[in-house]
């Protein structure tokens, strides 16, 4: 790695709680970029919460995020630990894009847009080993807890009490006249 000399790097065994706790106690924020988080993340998050350390990840595993929010949200607030999930591909263009658009719309029209649509026209790539492992872990979690499907099919499961805008009822391709393009909706986002 080409880190500046004043930035330390620690290698931690995610199965070794003592190693995790030692690392967490030496930092203000833990950034973890390798899942499956449902297999490796909870120990790190609970350690961060215990020490009031912030936590950021690339998680795209709604079942895991729901579990952590449900079980640890209040304790994290009390300890001053901020838990930030999903700082990866899905969030960067859309979450930050919507924020930027809404700020510009508000500045120009003195109100927010009632909805914002985002499209990815072309994308190259394939599933990483981590994504494939996360999918496999999610299938195993569904096998042991069939009720998890209710979290996975609800795009608002991570925002208790919030139902948001109406979602598409199906995942069939749709033609969008605004951009003259046929698209598929990502199942965990708005259309």
Predicted regions: what is each one?
Residues 14-26:
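Conserved Rossmann-fold cofactor-binding substructure of NAD(P)-dependent oxidoreductases
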Residues 3-14:
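Rossmann-fold cofactor-recognition segment
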Residues 77-181:
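Rossmann-like dinucleotide-binding core of oxidoreductases
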Residues 27-32, 56:
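N-terminal Rossmann-like NAD(P) cofactor-binding module of classical short-chain dehydrogenase/reductase
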């Amino acid at each position: 790695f080409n880190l500046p000399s004043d930035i330390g790097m620690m290698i931690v065994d995610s199965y070794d709680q003592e190693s995790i706790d030692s690392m967490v106690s030496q930092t203000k924020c833990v950034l973890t970029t390798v899942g499956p988080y449902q297999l490796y993340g909870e120990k790190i998050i609970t350690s961060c919460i215990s020490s009031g350390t912030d936590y950021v990840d690339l998680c795209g595993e709604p079942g895991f995020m729901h579990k952590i929010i449900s079980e640890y949200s209040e304790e994290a607030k009390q300890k001053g630990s901020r838990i930030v999930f999903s700082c990866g591909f899905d969030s960067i263009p859309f979450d930050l894009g919507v924020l930027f658009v809404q700020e510009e719309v508000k500045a120009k029209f003195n109100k927010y847009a009632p909805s914002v649509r985002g499209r990815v026209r072309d994308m190259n790539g394939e599933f990483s080993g981590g994504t494939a492992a996360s999918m496999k872990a999610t299938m195993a979690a569904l096998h042991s807890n069939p009720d998890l499907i209710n979290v996975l099919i609800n795009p608002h499961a991570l925002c208790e009490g919030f139902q948001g805008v109406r979602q598409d009822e199906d995942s069939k391709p749709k033609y969008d006249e605004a951009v003259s393009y046929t698209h598929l909706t990502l199942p965990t986002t708005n259309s």
